[in-house]
Amino acid sequence: LHLSIRRQRQMCIRDRYKEGMMDQVDRVIYDLKHTPFSRRILTNIYVHQDLHEMNLYPCAYSMTFNVTQKKGDDRLTLNGILNQRSQDVLAANNWNVCQYAVLMHMLAQVCDMRVGELVHVIADAHIYDRHVPIVKELIERPQYDAPKFWLNPDIKDFYQFTTDDIKITDYVTGEQIKDIPIAV
């Protein structure tokens, strides 16, 4: 996932639990494996004491995981809720959805779960005035079938994933739009 150095540090801070020292990702994986029906499985990178060091506060800032089980199914299903305070729809929507969907697949795989729903809650989704013509152009373009996503099924340790373990096939795209102005 693309995160600033400060945000990466927030995810890697290790805290003491009765089970030992863990960062947020370690804690999520531990809980998914040991207490999957807990209502406390989440990450949060919106750390107020660090905000003064950031040019841009975290937009997508927390992920809550919810595990369900369908009647008659031996495997559990991992669902997630992504909370986001703000989103530049043109510049970030596809990126946010894809990165957190891949994260869900990775976590589900290493915890031997099925992938369920990803619910994306955006408090302020916006299209800037200068983006309106670009968005109109994109809406008018031909639509293509969704590409296929593959995750190396042999990886069972979250920290062993590399970019080589993720493949996108049958990806068809129109002409690239370049130089999209980004607001900070």
Regions found by a protein language model. Name each.
Residues 20-23, 28-38:
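Structured secondary-structure scaffolds
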Residues 1-13:
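Single conserved hydrophobic/aromatic residue that forms the stacking wall/gate
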Residues 8, 24-28, 99-107:
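Short, hydrophobic/aromatic alpha-helical segments in well-folded domains
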Residues 34-159, 182-184:
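Conserved helix-adjacent loop modules within structured domains
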Residues 170-184:
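Structural signal for terminal/edge beta-strands and the immediately following C-terminal loop/tail
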Residues 165:
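Phosphate-rich cofactor/ligand-interacting catalytic cores and adjacent structured alpha/beta frameworks
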Residues 22-25, 115, 132, 177:
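Alpha-helix initiation and N-capping motif
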